[in-house]
């Protein structure tokens, strides 16, 4: 992984701090975001496997150093320092697949000022991108809870890495497979596919294209039915081929057509009627063509009979929100050998940050398993132990949640993922997918609806609110 995957100002700041002898002072940074993507009610965390690879392999080779030297803005001693640079700090993060909300720390970074500056850009790039894709995928899964969802976006992805890691993120978000062969190999994702119009057009007759495909790929009987005319040619030809297979006793358990154009609601209903009348009521109708959660929800409301969806462009590009606004902010700095809590001040209250080394606790209703809320507190505070507990929202202190003893459970969300520069084991992808599904089950429906969802209020502990108030008063000279 190239050490140049960073912004220039990160390097120039590190260069200047090196010259002042302040480059190895200890710091703690938090990564969080301020607004849910897609005007939704939540975000799904993804990207930790990629993050670990990035951190482990972040270094500067000889060519990198030569290039930086050619810019004539870096001290020679600093460039020598970069030659042996390796991250040796600690990172805590919320597990992949976790449902999260604005304002709470999703990643806590312990390192030196140089480490934080050099790694910030890459860490943010990875987590912002993959969490965005996972969230978009989960929204699609929400409107099609029982259908097959296939990620078809590679050719529309904004680069190779976006296509590769986006496919993995889509799986965390609830998809069943991908057309991306490399993602299948690297991540063990089921690879799926049917045929393209070019296959059908390679034959003089559509039915000959179907017959030849069936002859060579007998177990993959999803025939593309819209090359010419879905209802007058595609479906009748598919029925004829299925009849031939049935007579030969070779009709597989799964068979059907894909529709990639036209009015999918109308065409799917007519195709289902035609298949049923011909004795093939179990024929699968697969749909594709610029689909997203809104289109699929609308098609279903119109009686669409598609049960298998190929979603490409709008999943891999996270259509609707161009980027997740995740930020990476200092919360603690070293001064005179001590850890000093710090915060960002701003005229915009929403951009003020929370100071200190923090962690996040999540509360669930004991009887239903549904989420109650999250609590951000200082890391050395004692967690709720199951007794009576009061939660107070910082922005609305009159709205208090009184939790009675024995009615709730609690878990800490931030877990160690890198320790002293070494990666710690992460769950494998199938485990992450199951965990992500369970996470969604903890959300009340009002947080998952596509339009105007309710927004989870994050609570700050009394101790954290007091620390924040003290720093604000100090800044104001009170």
Language-model features and meaning:
Residues 47-50, 132, 428, 432:
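Short amphipathic alpha-helical segments
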